[in-house]
């Protein structure tokens, strides 16, 4: 039995990056031998085992053959006679098809090191076309390695796959899994640019794809193009180390601009509510986690009000916080403010601009939440008030607190 480190760990080491992704391929091994040695079987679709000491994943060398459309339409073959090169041949990109033996020797039959040096994402073999998820993976790797280009022959193959309807067979959960990982990369805009280039974005996320070419008012958006703006917002979210819910909210905040009637462009009156409706549709279709959906809905509805909050009085600010469920979910309110900052700074020439709305509204929430609502309710009850009148008294106390304290100079 020979053991080889493969995939991301080898690639990242060659790039001088730290990697927690250590996967191994076993050549010449069989299941009974591994079980006897204490390996723990965990694979469902093909033989994968955890090492008894390190708990790192070890897979039997295998080949695969396409038998049906979509992600699950594969037949896997694993036995001791499958060679390392046969196993590497089934992988997606040459940079992921490099192995290293236990003595440190690299095995690179498909030119992965050459493509790393050229900063190129290139498919290993025509079998790439058998798995539509690989289109998403290439886009995700483009977001991770932003200075890498997709090889011309790989771009051509991806376009052919889209034209043949392969991406239409992808299950929602798999699409979301790859999109989520791509959103969390250093330059998420590259993922969407690659998907758009091959036509996959129009099939998987038409709500996003149609934003390119939609103009915005230059006095608010010097970059003008809505698609360009969206990409700048996503990259700002990455720069500010935003969470996945924030990044998904950034992705969806302006979807409604893609449905603005042509005769009113470049204005987008009412796009917030249209965006919220589209975010809900996308979230349901891709089975996006609830936390991501709910934040995206709030951001889509309220980002314009947050941007304009300097002109809101205390009562309007308290109503804004209430609509965002800020009393019960202050952490989500903070995430909403971060998404709004990404939107404001994701514009041409505004990447370093201050966004005082975020700190000011966070302070307003803190002031309003400091109101002793139990005491206010008790005082209202003592005056003979009940029901909605108690809620109104609490609301008035919060408004008074914000009015008195929000813009007061520090003591």
Model-found features: residue ranges?
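Catalytic cores of the polymerase beta-like nucleotidyltransferase superfamily
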Residues: 1-411
């Amino acid at each position: 039995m020979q053991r080889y480190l493969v995939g991301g760990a080898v690639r990242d080491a060659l790039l001088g990056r730290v990697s927690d992704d250590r996967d191994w391929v076993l050549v010449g091994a069989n299941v009974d031998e591994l079980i006897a040695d204490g390996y723990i079987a965990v694979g469902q679709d093909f033989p994968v085992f955890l090492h008894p000491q390190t708990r790192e994943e070890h897979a039997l060398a295998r080949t695969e053959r396409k038998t049906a459309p979509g992600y699950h339409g594969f037949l896997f073959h694993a036995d001791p006679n499958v060679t390392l090169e046969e196993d590497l041949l089934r992988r997606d990109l040459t940079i992921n098809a490099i192995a290293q033996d236990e003595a440190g020797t690299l095995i690179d039959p498909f030119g992965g090191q050459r493509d790393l040096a050229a900063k190129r994402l290139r498919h290993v073999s025509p079998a790439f076309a058998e798995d539509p998820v690989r289109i998403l993976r290439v886009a995700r790797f483009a977001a991770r390695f932003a200075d890498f280009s997709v090889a011309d022959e790989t771009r051509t193959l991806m376009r052919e796959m889209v034209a043949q309807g392969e991406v239409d067979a992808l299950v929602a959960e798999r699409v979301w899994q790859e999109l989520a990982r791509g959103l969390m990369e250093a330059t998420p805009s590259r993922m969407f640019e690659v998907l758009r280039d091959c036509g996959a974005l129009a099939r998987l996320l038409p709500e996003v794809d149609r934003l390119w070419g939609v103009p915005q008012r230059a006095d608010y958006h010097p970059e003008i193009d809505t698609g360009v703006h969206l990409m700048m917002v996503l990259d700002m979210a990455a720069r500010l180390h935003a969470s996945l819910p924030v990044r998904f909210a950034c992705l969806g905040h302006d979807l409604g601009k893609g449905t603005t009637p042509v005769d009113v462009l470049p204005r987008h009156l009412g796009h917030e509510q249209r965006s919220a409706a589209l975010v809900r549709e996308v979230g349901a279709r891709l089975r996006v986690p609830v936390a991501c959906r709910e934040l995206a809905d709030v951001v889509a509805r309220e980002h314009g009000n947050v941007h304009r909050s300097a002109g809101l009085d205390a009562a309007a600010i308290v109503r804004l916080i209430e609509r965002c469920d800020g009393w019960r979910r202050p952490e989500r309110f903070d995430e909403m403010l971060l998404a709004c900052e990404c939107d404001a700074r994701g514009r041409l020439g505004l990447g370093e601009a201050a966004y005082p709305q975020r700190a000011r509204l966070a302070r307003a929430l803190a002031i309003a939440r400091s109101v002793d609502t139990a005491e206010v309710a008790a005082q209202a009850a003592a005056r003979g008030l009940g029901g909605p009148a108690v809620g109104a008294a609490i609301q008035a106390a919060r408004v008074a607190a914000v009015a008195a304290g929000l813009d007061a100079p520090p003591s």
